Every structure is written in structure tokens, then in C-alpha cells.
């Protein structure tokens, strides 16, 4: 049996069941485990309760239960500078950003690794559902987890070899159900704790509009069909995303009782374009352009400048077949779907896969239906 006692693993602990079981498993495997709670946002609510304080108490309880030291580190400044300002800037451009992808790249696997190194870490570990595989040349590859319904490679798609070489994902071979059972069997106080949802700085109560309006002034404007008919008033373009159905306040017409969906935005005119029907032609793109490309591995040497793979355009979506074509300088990518893709959203990540391997990702800029650019921003 391998003696892991001289290998220090610093675990990012959130106070949730996944990261708690991560620490537990590593402790059981004999590693020298240290727990660290990352405070990324001052999330005191209207009642003066800071959920981070409650979560830290849970970290302390779990760490004490399994017998490991624990610390708290404050990354509020790093988070503001590297993640939150990006989030707001994207909304100013009329886009819909995904802060989790950037947070993992900049905070959980950058600032956190730098801090863990100060604690003498050989590795860091998190409660993400993802797997790693090292090839014969020694390069690390990012792979999907066993529990495909919980797989989080989408959010880890901007990590690089240096980060992955330093990381352990102990939950790779477990389902969520099994993780909860492990927590119960060990008597962990968080065994039945609800999973956190939503963006950390908005919290679970989902007061998104209220929150965003503190940083960006909302400007009402017209809701129009693509042929210019005014059908309503929007509360501010930043509050809507492509393909959105809820919250439009529009009913059916005599001619058409289909529900309304957001099909586009014009940020210069402050117009929100809406259309009826889930299958509305204006919601479908044949191809898209994306930038801020990041490859986990050297994709060009493996596949060339043009290749076929699968992709996700949002986290919960099934993989879709796509053809990827890189620009000559490698800074832009054109992604052509095998079948037209619905509700492609600028600001979101398009994440590429070869089977179970996550190849990397890019940030969507524009979407097209044949030669016609969709009115997405």
C-alpha cells in the first residue's frame, strides 16, 4: 500500500457535502490533508446574516470530525478584480457571461493554488465532478466524471496543464448519490445539506435583477418582433438572455397562441427582440464565432486547424456534433453545428469534447443562420 503520509493535499472546502467528502476520502487514503475555506464575496444578506460565516462553521465542524487542520483565506479582492468586473463588463456589452468558468480559472485553480503552495501543498483537491488521465508522454488530460449528470468539466475547460498537474479530483469515480451516502456513513454534519445553486455573489434567493441594478443602471425599452412591431416593454436588456421564456409578460395573440421567447437584442437601439414558438427560426444558428480560446492540450498538433468533435453551448445540454475551424492566427474559432443549434448565447462558453475528454473552450461572440447574423447583441 502506498504511503501518502508525506504528501500534503490542500482541499478547497466550501462547507458542502462534495468538498467535505473529498477531504474525508483523502484522509482515509492516508494523505496529510489541510482544509481551506475560500471567502470570495461579502454576501451578508438583508437580515445581516453572512452565509459564508455559516458555511465556514460547517467546514470547521467537518474538519474537526475527520481530524484535519483548517484555515480560511480571503480572496474578495482577487474575485472582484478578476471575475466580477469581467461579469459586469460582459453585461454592459449585452452579453450573458458565465462567471463560474472564469472563477475556476482565476480563483479556485490559480489564487487558491498559490495560497496552497504557501502551506506546502504537493497537490490541491476540490469537490468537482471531473477526472484526470495522464498519457504516455506525461501530459494530463481533463476527462468527464463517472456521474455524467453532475460532470463539471464544462466549468473547468479553461484550466491548463500546470494547473491540472497540481490537482486531484477524488470524486471522479463516484455518483452524487454515493457521495451523500459516504457522508452519512461517516456521520458528517453536512450529509443532508442542500447543494448550493446559482452564482455565489447573487446567492440562492435569486434576486438577480435587484442585484445587477446596483452596478448597472437599467434602461427600459421596447420589445419588438423582428419586423418592427412593438409588443411590450422590457425592464433592461441585461436582464434577458437568448431563448428566455419566463418573465416577458406577453400573452398569445388571436392568430398565434404560442409562447414568446427572447430571440435577440440590439444594444445600440435598446430593443429586445421577441418571437413566438420554441422552434422559432430566429433562435437557430448554423454556426458561430468565438474567441478567448483555451485548449487544455495542444489540440492543433493532435487534430490540425480544422476538425470534427462534439460541443456543449451550455452546461446542462447534451453534446452536439460540430466542425471546428481555427483562424490562421489561432485567435478565433468558427464552430459549425451538424444540426442547427438553438439559443446560442454570446458571452457563454462553447466547450469542446472528444469522447469523454474535454479539449478546451472558447467564449461565443456571434451566431449566424447561414449568412445572416442573428440579432443577438
Swiss-Prot record:
Q: Which residues form a coiled coil?
A: none
Q: Which GO terms describe its biological process?
A: tRNA wobble position uridine thiolation
Q: By its UniProt entry, which InterPro entries does this protein fall under? A: MnmA-like, MnmA-like_C, MnmA-like_central, MnmA-like_central_sf, Rossmann-like_a/b/a_fold
Which reactions is this enzyme annotated as catalysing?
S-sulfanyl-L-cysteinyl-[protein] + uridine(34) in tRNA + AH2 + ATP = 2-thiouridine(34) in tRNA + L-cysteinyl-[protein] + A + AMP + diphosphate + H(+)
Top class in the EC scheme: transferase
Keyword ATP-binding on this protein? yes
Its GO CC terms are:
cytoplasm
Q: Which domain of life is it from?
A: Bacteria
Catalytic residue positions:
103 (nucleophile), 200 (cysteine persulfide intermediate)
Site annotation (Interaction with tRNA): which residues?
128, 348
Enzyme Commission designation: 2.8.1.13
- Please give the Pfam families that the UniProt record associates with this protein: tRNA_Me_trans (PF03054), tRNA_Me_trans_C (PF20258), tRNA_Me_trans_M (PF20259)
Q: Which UniProt keywords apply?
A: ATP-binding, Cytoplasm, Disulfide bond, Nucleotide-binding, RNA-binding, Transferase, tRNA processing, tRNA-binding
Q: Name one GO molecular function term.
A: ATP binding
- Protein family (similarity comment): Belongs to the MnmA/TRMU family.
Q: What does this protein do?
A: Catalyzes the 2-thiolation of uridine at the wobble position (U34) of tRNA, leading to the formation of s(2)U34.
Descriptive protein name: tRNA-specific 2-thiouridylase MnmA
Q: Which gene encodes it?
A: mnmA
